[in-house]
């Protein structure tokens, strides 16, 4: 089976099948999750110096920071699956 890759922005790709959540970075629990991932060495920053707008959480415990909106990333996942209904 081919691995589905998701464009997380600026030429960076993430294994779409490994993602369990795409969330906004604004809440305290998500900020704490990002901080804990940084301490564990499981934080991947693909923002290229831009403001973090989405946090992707993988099933491996890795936390990925992206400069794209969560809606944009979710839309890319749906488009890659061929599901354009959004539901």
Swiss-Prot record:
InterPro entries per the UniProt record, alphabetical: RemA-like
A Pfam family this chain is assigned to: RemA-like
Coiled-coil region list: none
Origin superkingdom: Bacteria
Family indicated by similarity: Belongs to the RemA family.
Name assigned to this protein: Putative regulatory protein Synpcc7942_1027
